[in-house]
Each structure stands twice: as structure tokens, then as C-alpha cells.
Amino acid sequence: MSNYSHVFQEFRPIVEQSNEDRLYFLEEDRWIGYPAANDLLDQLKGFLTLPKRSRMPNLLVLSKPNNGKTSIINQFFKLYGEGYVNAENNAVKPVIIVQAPVSPDEKALYMAILDKFWVPFRERDPVAKLRYQVVHCLKLYEVKLLIIDEMNSLLCGSPIKQRTVMNAIK
């Protein structure tokens, strides 16, 4: 039996597993940090420590498809975004990640955000009520960072709808 010295130590036990288990292992998500990704993680982490102000900074990350943007977001959430209960027994969700709606629709964006809080809502509720619920949840759960993935979906549709959604994000 070989000691598999050519295999990274952490992965040596995998070599002894069945073919099915090794293939499953190969298909699992794995984080491989690289300088640009680590820089982005550091920048996002910095946002978590900023004091509140009327217009908080924002960040738009652009790159070609399948370049790892969502993987970076998921890694950031894994490191810093998990919810917890604070000293006052209040639930805290420091980071909320939502998928942008497939079209620039303010109501759909609010529903996507509310869904992440597991808050009940009715699809037929007026936009103003959904907006109120979103703002309430963001404050209640002390959200420091709202990440909207696949923002390019919001660039479809008429310029008026795009502006409406962009104003909602502000």
C-alpha cells in the first residue's frame, strides 16, 4: 500500500474510498482562493465594519460569465454571513444574498429579499407594503450587507423599469 506522498495530505483518505465516493468528491464545490478573489473578499469584509450613514457605499462586480463571482459571494457568506443570536437574544443576519429577479421588477426584488428572511408575504400586496417589510427586516435582523447576484437580469426591460429597480436598491 502506498502512502500517496504525491497527494496533498488532506486528500489522501479520499484515495482509499470507492470509485463512487471519489467521483462524488470531485463534483463537490471547492474554494480555491486567488489574489483577485481574496482582494474582493477583503473589500466585502471591510463593508461589514463601516459605521452607518445615510448613503452606504456599494460595489458592482463585473466580469465575464463563469468567472467565479457567485463562488466568491458564497465563500464570503460562509466566512462572514451566517446568522446568529446576539447577546440580547435577537436573531442577526449580517449578510443577505438574493438572486436578482429575471426582469427589472421592484416588487419581485422585494419578494426575493423577503423570501431570504422567511417572512410571509402576499404576491398581491402593494409595492409600498413589501418595501416597508423589507426595510423592517433589514433593520430588525441588523443586516450589514445586501448582496444581489446576477444584477445583469435587472438591465433588461425598459429604461423606466430599470430606474425604478435601481432606485429601490438605493
Model-predicted regions and their roles:
Residues 147-170:
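Conserved Walker B catalytic segment
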